[in-house]
């Protein structure tokens, strides 16, 4: 019995008579398919199997590109506009325990919130108007979380302690005006400052500022560290970096240190993982006890960065950070490594004694070896400054660079006990030019620097639009910094051009400070006091400790009467500090220094510039050139 076509077990297949009708349809099928399906590499099956990782990456790129465009179109000045789940703290906090800032909101019938100007791991910083004092302030709003509140209370205690010992606000520390609790958030009210030093570097396209401006910044920072090191304070900042050093005014070189959120007092250390990586000291990397000297290490790194435009040690991780330090300074002393708990993370013993850097996966491939990257080459001591950019400029002679190099090397001593102290740094020959300027007898304003300003002239507009926070930049990560430096020529706009090279802070007399609680450099501690503040080997006078006024002085006229120091009335004041009284040695610091020095001979005193060349390994610097300033 014949089975009709289209029936039976194989009825799904075309019969012989239908075969000829199907073939044309099959031939036409590719024409009907979408163009995207014709490429095997773009087929959905391949995208969801073999190329699944590529598919996810593409989705992420598209998502974050759209997110970035939205962020650029609507600047986040008001955190209430963000799509956050407002379910915490009765709807006042977001999912990250940060207060939801609303522009125009009024707190305590006193503070009118203007905008959000900074955010960090601690919380947020807003700009606000104080209707009671009729001034703009910066309010640091701590996260509504117990751990952050506890740490902020330590910061509050240290800030109040510093305020008690710096009632005239002349030691370059940010001034805490008051504090209060608002909707379960601790709020710290600070004076409103301007841009930070990283913004200043970005404004130079990361080519660095002049040696003259670097000197002014260094003198203020050394004075601030000397203040923090007084026995009554003994405060370790623990996170000194360009982002935490702010200009008081965008047209002046007066600065203040901010963000004491990671700080502690000597003998009350809480954390082992401190300092931002680029500025982290060897003792912190190695896990040995640390003291106030870690801030001096950070300062040495900052000064080099401010002049060259790039970090001296820009490690991508701790192993890379140590390798970059070794490239410049060599292997740390053996006694220091033998006592370090984390020494074998970076180093290994040699069979015949001594230490060498471990070859690990984290060690970068272009590592050259100990001492192969000399500081004199980084600074361009004999080649006209970094990249030869300062060749022929006044104030950038080989003698100036020799003094600067010697000061930095003393700040970057491996052993904390051998590292120069703030008092020793202020007495260094690098500041002799500042002393000469301070004795200038010309008309008002003639004491301004004669060094040309690489930032050129000046400035425009106010600072209200892009003010940095007084809260600083908390945290110990440099990942974002590394990204910004690797893309430094493609970044956003910096602060407006300033003339802070030409306008130094008013130099006024101040009460002398005792040496830091941890003791001075060995050759300073056991010498007779220096009379009349004369710099050894130079005959120059030690400059009076500079002062940061609440309102910057005009470069061509004396400050107004309300800013004049009463000691200026009458005869010129005596700016020479009396011989410092011996500071009591803190037991922890004394034990640390005894353990770390290991019988090491003391450093020689700062030499005359004419003798610095041979001692630093430089040759060919004529005596007449080295002796000139």
From Swiss-Prot:
All disulfide bonds of the chain are none
Enumerate the InterPro entries for this protein. Answer: Kinase-like_dom_sf, PKc_DYR1A/1B, Prot_kinase_dom, Protein_kinase_ATP_BS, Ser/Thr_kinase_AS, Ser_Thr_dual-spec_kinase
Which residue numbers does the motif Bipartite nuclear localization signal cover?
A: 69-86
Q: Enumerate the residue ranges of region (Disordered).
A: 67-86, 380-399, 436-480, 496-629
Which classification does the entry list for the species? Eukaryota, Metazoa, Chordata, Craniata, Vertebrata
Residues that bind ATP, according to the entry? Answer: 117-125, 140, 190-193
Know the name of this protein?
A: Dual specificity tyrosine-phosphorylation-regulated kinase 1B
* PTM per Swiss-Prot/TrEMBL: Phosphorylated by MAP kinase. Tyrosine phosphorylation may be required for dimerization.
Q: Where is the Protein kinase domain?
A: 111-431
Coiled-coil residues are: none
The gene coding this protein: Dyrk1b
Give any Gene Ontology cellular component: nucleoplasm
Q: What is this protein's function? A: Dual-specificity kinase which possesses both serine/threonine and tyrosine kinase activities. Plays an essential role in ribosomal DNA (rDNA) double-strand break repair and rDNA copy number maintenance. During DNA damage, mediates transcription silencing in part via phosphorylating and enforcing DSB accumulation of the histone methyltransferase EHMT2. Enhances the transcriptional activity of TCF1/HNF1A and FOXO1. Inhibits epithelial cell migration. Mediates colon carcinoma cell survival in mitogen-poor environments. Inhibits the SHH and WNT1 pathways, thereby enhancing adipogenesis.
Phosphotyrosine modified-residue sites: 63, 92, 111, 129, 171, 271, 273, 401
Which proteins does it associate with, and in what oligomeric form? Dimer. Interacts with DCOHM, MAP2K3/MKK3, RANBP9 and TCF1/HNF1A. Part of a complex consisting of RANBP9, RAN, DYRK1B and COPS5. Interacts with DCAF7. Interacts with RNF169.
Q: Recount the known activity regulation.
A: Inhibited by RANBP9.
Native organism is: Mus musculus (Mouse)
- The residue ranges flagged as biased composition, category Low complexity, are 438-477
Protein's UniProt keywords contain rRNA processing? no
Predominant location category: nucleus
